[in-house]
Each structure stands twice: as structure tokens, then as C-alpha cells.
Amino acid sequence: MSIEWYAVHTLVGQEEKAKANLEKRIKAFGLQDKIFQVLIPTEEVVELREGGKKEVVRKKLFPGYLFIQMDLGDEEEPNEAWEVVRGTPGITGFVGAGMRPVPLSPDEVRHILEVSGLLGKKEAPKAQVAFREGDQVRVVSGPFADFTGTVTEINPERGKVKVMVTIFGRETPVELDFSQVVKA
């Protein structure tokens, strides 16, 4: 058994979808003993918003790639895990020459995990949420200020909330920062 990290190509912007598809296939095929981790490495960066406001956001380090820790099997005969990864919707193939993927070096893996904050760093605290799905909220800032709507989705990791507001007589989903809404 040789457990290594491998990089696979995905469609840019479809990394999360490819990861979700792969995780479903791992469970469906019972390969938790062959495929151990699937990562989309990200790093925290500060972006400057309107009005000079700074916001910390997570950006993908390697758009178009997933990193998978797995046991690929023998040189001559890759195992079922190899086929499951290659056949996953959204994954276009392993990084490597010919038929055999090339594993990442320990230094590459350590660097990716360190920059992502997964090795030797604490996870950033998550934002506190003052409302739940289905709650009525009022928008207090931005282009939709003074609109009211219903919370349909909450993303604490990104500090975002999706609210259905009525614009020109139509229900429209709007993604807002937590700081832009208050409970009605």
C-alpha cells in the first residue's frame, strides 16, 4: 500500500462540483480505504471593497485542480480507485506523464497544506449568525437597502446570506454579506 498525494485536472470554476461528485462516488463504491482526502487548497486574502472597506476572503490557490490523497495501487495494475477518480464528472484527468500519474513530492504537499492553513495553523473563527433560513430580514446597506425578504440560504464560511427580495414585482435571490442584513 503506497499512499501518495496526486493532482487532478478539473474544469476551472467547477472544482467544488468535481469534489462533491468524487466524494459521492467514493462512498458509492466503498473506497474510503483507498481514497482518503480530497482538497481544494485555498488561502486567505484581504480584498478592498467599496468605500475602502477591507474584507478577508478565501481564494483558490490552484484553479482547475483538486488534490487527492490515495492509494493508487501497483505500477502495472492501478486499482479501482484510479478508475473511479478518472471517471468522475468534472475531473478531466490526472497530472502526469503517460498512463501513470506522478505523485506530489512531500515538499509540495507540505507547502500546499501550510499555505492553505491545514498544517500548523488554527482555523479562522466563523462569523456568528443572528438569523436562520426562513427568517424575515431587512437589508440595511448596499443597493438593496430598505428591502425586506426571506433568508433562503446561509453560508457562514463566506459570511454570506441569500435572501429572496421582491424587485419589480418578482421574487429575486440576492446574495449579501451578514453585515448588510438585520432580522426584521
Swiss-Prot record:
Residues 133-163 form the KOW domain. The keyword Transcription regulation applies. PROSITE patterns: NUSG. One of its GO terms (cellular component) is cytosol. Disulfide bonds: none annotated. Keywords: Transcription, Transcription antitermination, Transcription regulation, Transcription termination. Belongs to the NusG family. NCBIfam families: nusG. This is Transcription termination/antitermination protein NusG. It comes from Thermus thermophilus (strain ATCC 27634 / DSM 579 / HB8).
